[in-house]
């Protein structure tokens, strides 16, 4: 018994991610710390003019417990550090050809041997990187030579230009398309506490 006509389809997608990063660390007298970093990322899936984006960041810390004026100020205090940071990160969570109008093939419902080509997505060359800005301020502390230690962190992050699917009017002939349309903000406080109840030394 014959199997009928056999059709073969192939799909090929190609894209490229490239990233460059540089970082500089500075430490003075084990008291003052400064770190600066810079990242440049590229994604071939974006249109010309939007393929590359820059994401800098900076952080600083101050070990207060190393300062003379902090000695014997707080009973039992063995370590105290203030720190802060601010930086940008990027996200390119789209498919390889999301900025282009793409086509697909199909068969007519009345004649399976008739092949036709149709446009199945809209172009949006304005798509660009989603960017998250994050700031953090923290305090690390230790008491009794580290038998009690912990940290307090206050953070806030905001993501702009999130890459989301947005519904389109029926008259366009498409149900949805990708846009830089989302925004989300996170903020909070994190606490941690560690204790050494039994020291075997």
Q: What do these predicted ranges mean?
A:
Residues 1, 5-201:
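Extracellular/periplasmic, surface-exposed regions of secreted and cell-surface proteins
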């Amino acid at each position: 018994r014959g199997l009928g006509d056999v059709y073969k389809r192939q799909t090929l997608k190609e894209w490229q991610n490239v990233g460059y990063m540089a970082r500089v660390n500075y430490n003075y007298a084990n008291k003052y710390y400064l770190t600066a970093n810079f990242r440049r990322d590229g994604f071939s899936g974006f249109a010309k003019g939007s393929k590359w984006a820059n994401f800098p960041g900076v952080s600083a810390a101050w070990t207060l417990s190393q300062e003379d004026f902090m000695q014997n100020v707080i009973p039992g205090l063995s370590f105290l550090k203030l720190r802060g940071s601010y930086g940008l990160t990027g996200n390119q969570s789209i498919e390889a050809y999301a900025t282009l109008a793409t086509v697909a093939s199909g068969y007519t419902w009345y004649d399976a041997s008739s092949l036709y080509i149709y446009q199945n997505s809209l172009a949006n060359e304005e798509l660009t990187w989603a960017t998250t800005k994050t700031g953090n301020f923290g305090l690390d502390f230790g008491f009794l030579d580290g038998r009690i230690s912990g940290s307090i962190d206050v953070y806030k992050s905001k993501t702009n230009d999130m890459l989301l699917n947005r519904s389109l009017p029926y008259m366009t002939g498409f149900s949805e398309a990708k846009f830089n349309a989302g925004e989300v903000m996170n903020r909070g406080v994190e606490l941690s506490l560690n204790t050494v109840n039994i020291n075997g030394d």
